[in-house]
Regions:
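Glycine-rich phosphate/pyrophosphate-binding beta-alpha loops
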Residues: 70, 95-101, 146, 187-190
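Short glycine/proline-enriched turns and hinge-like loops at secondary-structure junctions
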Residues: 5-6, 73-75, 99-104, 118-121, ...
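Internal helix-loop-helix
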Residues: 1-58, 98-105
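Short Ser/Thr-interspersed hydrophobic loop/turn segments at strand-loop and sheet-helix junctions
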Residues: 14-18, 110, 127-132, 157-161
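A short core secondary-structure module
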Residues: 91-137
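A short, Trp-centered hydrophobic/proline-enriched beta-strand micro-motif
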Residues: 57-66
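A structural signal for short hydrophobic beta-strand segments in well-ordered beta-sheet cores
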Residues: 79-82
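Glycine-rich beta->alpha junctions and the first turn(s) of the following alpha-helix
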Residues: 124, 136-228
Length: 228
């Protein structure tokens, strides 16, 4: 399925989208290079099928990683998933979650503890927002730009995750975080592409204005101060 574009071609399309509307470019990146990438890499057949069906229905999965005290240093997250029988109980808080309030499928990162309280590493857990008890969407958070795509707080209060909704890389929880992060390399490129598109759009608009606006009888684009 899909248009069959290469990764380079897809980013060229995103760049042009972002040149006109940054949020639109970012929505494409988040929907095609974010959580869905990790699910395709490490999800089971049933998990991949579930995610694909939701995306085809219009959903854009949300990635729940960032916390108030764990931004760039994401490995310092405190959200935890405690194993109880064949389930995991997730408690914690995430913020700046892109599309958190509108996405149905959430990929949640949390520290994993076995039934004896021993930490196992960091894992990924899938939850469907409107079916999950214990997943609560908080306030929409203000941003300087890209306001066309919402950023929200997400709270987990004894959220139950069944074993079949655990995203498990072959390395298990010990190296799971590193493996899952590697699955986001395409999203990192996409984020840079959106930034480049915004810069291109800004340059085009500035150039058009400088060629149209006149002072002292000629376009201001002809003045050395604007040509530097």
């Amino acid at each position: 399925g899909g248009p069959g574009h290469s990764f380079l071609e897809a980013n060229l399309v995103v760049e042009e989208m972002a040149a006109f509307c940054g949020p639109t470019g970012r929505i494409v990146v988040e929907g095609n290079m974010g959580a869905i990438s990790a699910i395709l890499h490490y999800g089971t057949e049933s998990q991949r099928r579930m995610a694909a069906e939701m995306v085809l229905a219009g959903d854009k999965p949300a990635i729940c990683i960032t916390e108030p005290d764990a931004g760039s240093a994401a490995s310092q997250m405190t959200t935890r998933a405690d194993k109880r029988g064949d389930k995991y109980i997730v408690n914690g808080k995430k913020h700046w979650i892109t599309g958190g309030g509108v996405s149905r499928l959430h990929l949640i990162f949390a520290r994993v503890f076995d039934e004896g309280g021993n930490e196992q590493g960091i894992g990924g857990f899938l939850a469907i927002r409107d079916e999950a008890k214990g997943l609560r969407i908080g306030a929409r958070e203000p941003t300087m730009g890209l306001r066309g795509i919402p950023e929200t707080e997400v709270f987990f209060e004894d959220l139950e995750i069944s074993a079949d909704m655990v995203l498990m890389p072959p390395s298990g929880f010990k190296r799971g975080f590193a493996d899952l992060m590697n699955a986001y390399n395409s999203q990192r490129v996409g984020a840079g592409t959106v930034a480049l598109g915004l810069a291109v759009g800004g340059y085009r608009n500035a150039l058009a204005f400088a060629q149209e606006r006149e002072q002292f009888g000629r376009p201001i684009a002809e003045f050395q101060g604007l040509q530097w």
